């Protein structure tokens, strides 16, 4: 979102403040496959090797919630016309279209439970959802307060995860004729 809005890593951290007010949720319509990749950073005398992990072939629905509708609309516009290229972890991992399904008036939990699935799978029994809560969740430190290479900083939020049972064929009711 910050890249889409044109916020640079070394910009004033105050530019991130409106984004820290967003409530965030994710539904994993397709969990994907964990891909292990390694990177070599060449130093003067030695090369550092690091391992990174990515999800391949995953499909997620992301919901943002805010009391500030104009903020959501500006984010939606920026995601459709980003200042900087959008990618997920690596520049070789761009998100697929559509990126924005619209700005709606529902809360994140309702959106995660009612939006049509982005990946159809007749054998799926449930999907995992993760969403921000004000109490009764697990603490995670992933709210970006600064993207600076020298002073990267993250704040805390509370999230809850649950499995959502999927009605694999809501149009077909075998017992409706009995």
Task: Report the location of each language-model feature.
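Internal, well-folded beta-alpha domain core
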Residues: 27-178
